[in-house]
């Protein structure tokens, strides 16, 4: 098949999943064409059957802002006609689904459109009064719609009352890349022998509650030697950095900005923290689980579908910093519990979220679309 994929190329779950999906599909013999304003963060530069088409950002005095939705639609249509695309698979409803629907009209209606909902396109952006009606239209005009969790599927139904079914296909991870291991040399760059390393990875938006990560770590390091790695960047980073200085722990916290080698970072971590206000799935938690790194997260949204509470990870209420700190200490002190959580997490990924289990679900959906 010849498949077009559009996603945000920035540091976040939807872009990471879309990029990995494209890689996996190309390895299975499909021709995959990415269409976006920049190369997706995790997309390799050179790979057989994998292509990138950059959207040109036009500048015209009449426009106060570049009309990206329209320029993206035009590029989608151009690539469809030039490359003979069978379908467009867009990740994130706004504006990508709107652009795909416009592109379909531009090429005469023969193009199939699949929209995958990832979370904030529904729970934050889409519910804005100025975008609510167009979000609903984009969902209803897509030929198929998927959501990354049952939680998100239900939220979409309750909020937008769509006139078509929404299929749940979960996010996935390549377990051959995200696998257990320990890199003592890399650990030595951050911690002394005997020190524990806690890890957080996110886009540092307010919903990630990165200051909770700092406060959890502050409690842990008072009881045992430990370091914290904060990976990513975003609007909350300065606030988090200020808090480390305020709590006099800045020498124990490393802000590493955006990193490409996430599997390598997992190999230095003893524990992963994700105290988010809301997660429609929680890809970072899944990647940690695949690497056998125990996860402590919040009992919200799709995280309850990813993590079997008390079996493959530990969950606490949003804002329960003391509770998460206690759980962190319990896991770091009890080697048996740490080992059990690590093994159960890896097992859950292999059984439910490994790429070879999920990619065929998308392929089947593509075939279903094209056979209509």
Language-model segments: which ranges?
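Short hydrophobic beta-strand element within catalytic cores of glycosyltransferases
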Residues: 294-297, 307
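A short helix/loop element that forms part of the nucleotide-sugar donor recognition site in Leloir-type
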Residues: 179-192, 361
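Conserved acidic donor-binding segment of nucleotide-sugar-dependent glycosyltransferases
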Residues: 309-310, 314-321, 330-336
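Conserved donor-binding/catalytic core segment of Leloir-type glycosyltransferases
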Residues: 192-217
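Aromatic "clamp/platform" in nucleotide-sugar-dependent glycosyltransferases that forms part
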Residues: 258, 277
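Carbohydrate-associated surface elements
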Residues: 151, 172
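Nucleotide-activated donor-binding/catalytic signature segment of Leloir-type glycosyltransferases, i.e.
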Residues: 241-257
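N-terminal strand-loop element at the rim of the active site
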Residues: 5-11, 18, 23-70
């Amino acid at each position: 098949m010849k498949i077009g994929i559009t996603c945000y190329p920035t540091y976040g779950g939807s872009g990471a999943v879309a990029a990995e999906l494209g890689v996996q599909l190309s390895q299975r013999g499909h021709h995959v064409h990415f269409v976006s304003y920049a190369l997706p963060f995790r997309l390799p530069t050179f790979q057989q059957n994998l292509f990138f088409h950059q959207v040109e950002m036009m500048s015209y005095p009449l426009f106060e802002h570049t009309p990206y939705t329209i320029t993206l639609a035009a590029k989608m249509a151009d690539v469809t006609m030039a490359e003979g695309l069978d379908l467009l698979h867009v990740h994130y409803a706004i504006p990508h689904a709107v652009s795909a629907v416009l592109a379909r009209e531009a090429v005469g209606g023969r193009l199939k459109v699949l929209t995958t909902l990832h979370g904030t396109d529904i729970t934050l952006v889409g519910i804005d009064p100025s975008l609510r009606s167009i979000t609903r239209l984009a969902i209803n005009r897509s030929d198929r719609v998927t959501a990354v969790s049952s939680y998100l599927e239900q939220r979409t139904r309750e909020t937008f009352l769509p006139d078509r079914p929404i299929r749940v296909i979960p996010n996935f991870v390549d377990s051959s890349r995200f696998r257990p291991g320990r890199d003592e040399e890399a650990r030595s760059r951050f911690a002394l022998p005997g020190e524990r390393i806690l890890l957080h990875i996110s886009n540092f938006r307010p919903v990630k509650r990165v200051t909770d990560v700092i406060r959890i770590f502050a409690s842990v390091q008072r009881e045992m030697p430990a370091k914290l790695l904060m990976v990513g960047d975003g609007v909350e980073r300065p606030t988090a950095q200020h808090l480390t200085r305020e709590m006099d722990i800045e020498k124990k916290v490393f802000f590493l900005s955006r990193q490409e080698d996430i599997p390598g970072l997992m190999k230095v971590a003893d524990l992963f923290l994700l105290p988010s206000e809301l997660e429609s799935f929680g890809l970072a938690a899944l990647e940690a689980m695949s690497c056998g790194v125990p996860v402590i997260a919040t009992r919200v949204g799709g995280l309850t579908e990813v993590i079997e509470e008390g079996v493959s990870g530990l969950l606490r209420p949003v804002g329960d910093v003391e509770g998460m700190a206690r759980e962190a200490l319990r896991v770091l002190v009890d080697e048996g519990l740490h080992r059990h959580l690590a093994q159960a997490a890896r097992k859950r990924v292999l059984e439910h979220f490994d790429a070879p289990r999920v990619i065929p679900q998308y392929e089947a959906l593509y075939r279903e679309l094209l056979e209509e």
